Amino acid sequence: MYYGFDIGGTKIALGVFDSGRQLQWEKRVPTPRDSYDAFLDAVCELVAEADRRFGCKGSVGIGIPGMPETEDGTLYAANVPAASGKPLRADLSARLDRDVRLDNDANCFALSEAWDDEFTQYSLVMGLILGTGVGGGLIFNGKPITGKSYITGEFGHMRLPVDALTMMGLDFPLRRCGCGQHGCIENYLSGRGFAWLYQHYYHQPLQAPEIIAFYDQGDEQARAHVERYLDLLAVCLGNILTIVDPDLVVIGGGLSNFPAITTQLAERLPRHLLPVARVPRIERARHGDAGGMRGAAFLHLTD
C-alpha cells in the first residue's frame, strides 16, 4: 500500500492507495503548530493506524509546501512552523523504520495528474496552479523535476513579460510580491490577482467568485475583465511554454473551476509561441482535493 500525506499549515491529510492507484482510506488531523515532537507524533500515529488497518507496512510519501530538504537536510516550510528547520525526512524515516520521501506540494499535484490513467501517455506534463498563489510542477517520464533548490515550477515568481506591459499599459503597477520582488505574475494571475485586476480597472472590491457569477450572468464589465485576464494569462504562459514545451498542461487551484480558463486559453496561445510550436493539450485537474495525497503516495512509483 502507498501512503500519501498532504501537509499544510492547518491540516495533515493521509490517503492510502492500493497498487491500482485507487484511494482506499483517508483521514485528516490538525497540524500541530508549535511542537515538532507533536508534529512527528501526529504523522507517525496516522501511519501506525494505516498499518494496522491494512495489515502491512506501507510506503510513505509526503507533500509539503516549501523546500522539502535543504543542503543541510532540513525542511524549509514557512507555513508549517513546527517542522521548518528540522530534518523531517531523516527523523520520520528513523521513527517509522522505512524510506520516507518528501517533495514540494506543487510537484505532488503535478505528479498526481501525470499518473492519471489517461495522462500517462504524455512524457512531459506541466501542472499549473492558479489558486491563492501561482505555482506548479514538471513531470518527465513519470518523475518530478525538482532542481537543486526544489524551485522548479515556481512559475508565479516570473516577472511580467514586456508584451504584458504593452497590453496592460506601460504605467501598469508592478506590485510588490511576498518574495520581495516587484511584478511577479502571481500578483495578477492568482485568485487574489484576478480580483485585484478587477478592482484596479473598475474600482469595485469584488472577490473572484462574485466576478465569475457576474460573468455567467452576461455582465459586460465582468466579461471584459475575463477577456483581459485570459489574454494576460496567455502572454505569461506563452513564455513558459516556449521554455518547457510540454505535451500536456493540467490546471489546478480555485480558478481551475472556472470553465473559461481551460476552454478559452488554448486559442489565445499561438500568437505568443514560436511559429513551429504546437499548443499543448490543456485540461482541468481531475483529482481535486485528493491530488496532493495521491501525488505524495506516488513518489514511491518513480523508481
From Swiss-Prot:
GO MF, one annotated term: N-acetylglucosamine kinase activity
Top-level lineage group: Bacteria
Pathway in which the depicted protein is active: Cell wall biogenesis; peptidoglycan recycling
Keyword Protease: no
GO biological process terms held by the UniProt record: N-acetylglucosamine metabolic process; peptidoglycan turnover
Binding-site list for Zn(2+): 157, 177, 179, 184
Binding site for ATP: 4-11, 133-140
UniProt catalytic activity: N-acetyl-D-glucosamine + ATP = N-acetyl-D-glucosamine 6-phosphate + ADP + H(+)
Keywords: ATP-binding, Carbohydrate metabolism, Kinase, Metal-binding, Nucleotide-binding, Transferase, Zinc
InterPro entries reported for this sequence: ATPase_NBD (IPR043129), N-acetyl-D-glucosamine_kinase (IPR023505), ROK (IPR000600), ROK_cs (IPR049874)
Family the entry assigns: Belongs to the ROK (NagC/XylR) family. NagK subfamily.
Protein name stated in the entry: N-acetyl-D-glucosamine kinase
Species of provenance: Escherichia coli O127:H6 (strain E2348/69 / EPEC)
Gene name linked to the record: nagK
